[in-house]
Amino acid sequence: MPASKYAGWSRDQLISRILELDGKLQKNTNSLPNKEIEGKNEVIKNKNKLDNGNEIEPQHLSQELVLQHALQDASSLPKLKPVRPFQLEKTVFVAFKFAYCGWNYNGLAYQLEPTPLPTVEGKVFEALLRAHLITDPSSCSFSRCGRTDKGVSAMGQVISLNVRHSERRPIIYCDVLNRLLPADIRITGYAFPPEGFDARFSCKQRHYKYLFTKDYPGGSLDIDRMNEAAALYLGEHDFRNFCKIDASKQITNYHRRILSSKVICIDPSTGLYAFDLQGTAFLWHQVRCMMAILFLIGQKLEPASLINDLLDIKKVPTKPIYDMASEYPLILYDCDFDNIEWTLPTDSPTTAPRIAKHTYETIYHQWHSLRIREQIASFMLDIADHNVKRYGKSEESSSTMNVGEGLLKRTKKYIPILSRQRQESVEVVNERYKRKKGLKDSDVKSENIK
């Protein structure tokens, strides 16, 4: 091949060509008789020298010659400018509002250790890095509003951080990031918050919805009874009996204020409802524990007064053991802040039509795909329902408990919540953690949020 043919080749292409030629030469050499090989090597050894006078060993000869030839041809290539490390010349503090479907992720928060599924923040950081909006997630003043667990979704999650800024050519952040993010994570707005803003501590209230159906195999929930019980959550209470204790945070104040608590109908035709809950802040697994108790009350396994009993820590000082409601129906629906004006993806007059259409089509595709799957599952349910009607329902002596997401838990005999075994007290759990870690009281930074 003439040397001019190599002029447009990249470094990787040249190396690949070298290896290809070397392989062919070795193959041809191996096919020669031993005496012929020895003769050729002797001739080559006597004739070929490197510029510095060092002999080329026969076993390396083919590679050296081909490499030398390729490098000579490559000398005619235009010299490329060295790539400079990417640096942020100017940054701006931005808050991003975004939505995500949680069932494909191992929760919101980025994890240093490997996880079975990716995390939402992991995907967001990947997009930010690919877009050259940040250089290092650990040095961009990052904060999140509400940490959601594996399987939990969000429609109004908020993060804040420093990102690249350009005055000469404004960056359309929503469009840039949504092009790089998975279809089930969408940036829905951004804002330039006031000084001192923190996505977590500046949040005034958080809004959750927990979806469920009224009917389930073997029973139906009493919605009026659940609404009556939900109203008992209103106000400020000690919710230590409605959460999972996280000893690493050394929380001592379990008081939280609930602003709104009710059961609402989402779709009368399908019997879909939601536990609609708003509060200033929430404890770990608090909403799922509150929902679990509402399920028991809706099934008439417990009285509505159970909520008052569990909120009275003098009467019930430690949490009775009970199962939380399933995680998948839970949604962090919105987060509310003062003095924040969100810029929507469609606020730019030049790009609004294109962005609006692309966003709608992306979300529509997800919705349509799930709708088709729902209908397929519905056909299967019809078959199962036909078999149940044909053979009749079996008489069972066990109790059935609805734990959300269409899941049922059966037990031979239902044990009332207040008659169950209790967990250890908050004080005992916190103290044991300190001893295990070798911490003193002065070393502990308690995380108490109201």
Curated annotation (Swiss-Prot):
One of its GO terms (biological process) is mRNA pseudouridine synthesis. CDD domains: PseudoU_synth_ScPus3. GO terms for molecular function: lyase activity; pseudouridine synthase activity; RNA binding; tRNA pseudouridine synthase activity. It is found in: Cytoplasm; Nucleus. Its EC number is 5.4.99.-. The active site is at D149. It comes from the Eukaryota. The keyword Hydrolase does not apply. It is an enzyme of class 5 (isomerase). It catalyses: a uridine in tRNA = a pseudouridine in tRNA. The keyword Flavoprotein does not apply. Substrate binds at Y208. One of its GO terms (cellular component) is nucleus. Keywords: Cytoplasm, Isomerase, Lyase, Nucleus, tRNA processing. Belongs to the tRNA pseudouridine synthase TruA family. This is Putative tRNA pseudouridine synthase C25B8.05.
